Amino acid sequence: MRDFKHFGVKRRFFPDRNYNAIWCNLKTIRLGEGKALELPSGESEFYDVGINTKCNAECPFCYVSATGKGVNYPNICETWKKWMSTFWETKKKEIILTNKPFQIAIGSTGEPTIHPEFCEFLKTVYESGVVPNYTTNGITLALDSDLSEQLLDATRRYVGGVAVSFGNKSLRPYARRAIEKLIECGETKINIHHVISDIKSVDEFIQEWNAYGNLILYHVLLPLMPSGRSTTGIEEGVWEYLEEMIQKNHIENVAFGAHFIKNLRTSKIKTWLYDEESFSKNVILTENKVQITPSSFNLQPIQTIQF
């Protein structure tokens, strides 16, 4: 497993927000006491990044309604470089002081692996001192093609972690093959995204957790939301069953989507909680324009940076 120690130790410090964070080798430690205030939208610790609205899956539950008729935003590498040039970074002794984001997750508005600039974009983000991660349905990775090999090579060289979605049952053969290839690659952390909607979806998550063991860093649980193409949400009583099964099986390598926060506040499962969108925002990266939105569920821009 490759590490990011060569990125150094980084610190982001906003005393007026009661925020003090140290990052090293893909781990973030937030220091201090009391509650940190929401960070400025243009200086978030972490961003979800949308580089297209195009997708090769068109899942019925997609919360952004991405389709095969969507678009790949052009010149994303140049736009990223221009945006990163607006941040500051300085070294004090052995610590890098910065207001740059520590990491990003690519794929908030479409399937990133089908963007023609994607591999180059991973390199561009990496060379800017920010760790690129991405979410995928697994189709491109799973296929035996030159593009798949190029993507695996770029992932091996530049990426911190890959999240493979298991939400669409018809695509799971692709998702499984993608995970097999990532495991064989051995150079990146692997997560699985599970959409939790009913009792059966919980049972399927437990089954996959048992099957993969410690090969998966985190199983990320996302509640079905009535957004985009989905018209329904998680069924009543499913959270209680999920909570019971996690405790019964002593599952520790699990993470929860932000929309579970209300359940987690009173849950028996011990987790670190912070307000939704307080340290992160979503970005839509188009040609010479960065649009910052509250989240990937709310794509209404709250800040636009034009170059």
What does each of the following model-derived ranges do?
Residues H115-P116, T232:
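Active-site cleft segment of glycoside hydrolase catalytic domains centered on the general acid/base Glu
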Residues E38-K82, T86:
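Canonical Radical SAM [4Fe-4S] cluster-binding loop centered on the CxxxCxxC motif
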Residues M1-D48, A66, S280:
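N-terminal [4Fe-4S]-dependent radical SAM core
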